[in-house]
Amino acid sequence: MLEQLTSLPDWLARGVADLFPLATNNSEKDQSLLLRLSQASRSNVPLRVKLGIDPTGSEIHLGHSIIFRKLRAFQDAGHTAILIIGDFTARIGDPTGKSKTRVQLSPEEVEKNSENYLNQLGKGQSKETSLLDFETEGRLEVRRNSEWLEGFDMVQIIDLLSKSTVGQMLAKEEFANRYTSGTSIALHEFLYPLFQGYDSVAVQADVELGGVDQKFNVAMGRDMQRHFSQKPQFGLLLPILVGLDGVQKMSKSLGNTVGLAEDALSMYSKLEKVPDSQVNNYLTLLTDCEIRDLTLNARELQKFMALNVTAQFHGLSVAKIAQKDASKIVSGLKETVEDVPVLSVSNVNFPTKAFHLLSSIGLCSSSSNARRQIQGGALRIDGKKILDPNFEFVDQKDIVGKILQLGKKTFRRISN
């Protein structure tokens, strides 16, 4: 695979974890993505590059952005991005990575989440600071898979089911694990990869993007296209981003995310503390920076990465202001985060509200004083201002490791 990736242009190969199918001999040379790109260029017919998202939550974070950045790279190269909002499949829920059946969402929840996603991706914004190009004609199609799936009758569903087998479904790791452990698998969950695969048929995808955990679903799209006499798509898979803890994947449930909707100061402050072991990975997956020739020490590299990632979403001038403000926050004017006094929350009962937290850890003399300070804009967590005294910290992980600022001079690094 490495040889195939090195033959691709850098904008396409950068950060890619897997590409399939691979052309292994001359008889399969027509299965080369490079050849398909060349044909598209000569014919002036752009490739149709599919990315499906199920709006099961309300927030997009940097871990999600990796795949959207690759979709944007295809747009900038002149191809057509097909963003499929899985408003129909979201009602089933992708079983990937799940050890039990997902809770089904209502159509109203799905639609609300869909609009939140599109706004975070840059709908209505300039393309300079948006993840996707919503402006250039012909570069983006936003489709909802309810367009074709909601009208399926029983005959069509049975026909779709006939394209796969129970054995194929149990080859999917999550299904296999649940089957062997005796955990139930609802029959409707088998429909998810089939419907998701049919999406590729409906939009006539040439390429599908996905995370490395989505290979089964992307391959199902290829199978479906063959069954419906279409040329099978290429699968291009991107890695999973490690979260701010430097250990586990970035996930809202783990409290180690950076949200796209966060203000510049909050985003920069979090990124500046990414563990050294992950900084190069963040630079590779979240920026277009050429890092081979950089001669920066570890701390300088952290700041360089934080600035460049923040600039993508807020612009360079705003990112530089955030960098200066973050420097003041962590130093008062001390050198590093490690210089900020540590304050434990081990005696705080979670969940807890912001005003109660401040009085519990002794930073405010009373709950009423804490409320006044918060309402006056004195409280920041990792640079993000909190104005609601009743803002709730559900668990220690919501605050441990972060910098709490109260007023202009009080800074504490929260520990458990």
UniProtKB/Swiss-Prot annotation:
Residues 352-416 form the S4 RNA-binding domain. A motif ('KMSKS' region) lies at residues 249-253. Its EC number is 6.1.1.1. SUPFAM superfamilies: Alpha-L RNA-binding motif (SSF55174), Nucleotidylyl transferase (SSF52374). Keywords: Aminoacyl-tRNA synthetase, ATP-binding, Cytoplasm, Ligase, Nucleotide-binding, Protein biosynthesis, RNA-binding. Transmembrane segments: none annotated. GO terms for biological process: tyrosyl-tRNA aminoacylation. The keyword Transmembrane helix does not apply. GO terms for cellular component: cytosol. GO terms for molecular function: ATP binding; RNA binding; tyrosine-tRNA ligase activity. It is found in: Cytoplasm. A motif ('HIGH' region) lies at residues 55-64. It catalyses: tRNA(Tyr) + L-tyrosine + ATP = L-tyrosyl-tRNA(Tyr) + AMP + diphosphate + H(+). It is an enzyme of class 6 (ligase). ATP binds at K252. It comes from the Bacteria. Belongs to the class-I aminoacyl-tRNA synthetase family. TyrS type 2 subfamily. HAMAP family: Tyr_tRNA_synth_type2. Homodimer. Catalyzes the attachment of tyrosine to tRNA(Tyr) in a two-step reaction: tyrosine is first activated by ATP to form Tyr-AMP and then transferred to the acceptor end of tRNA(Tyr). This is Tyrosine--tRNA ligase.
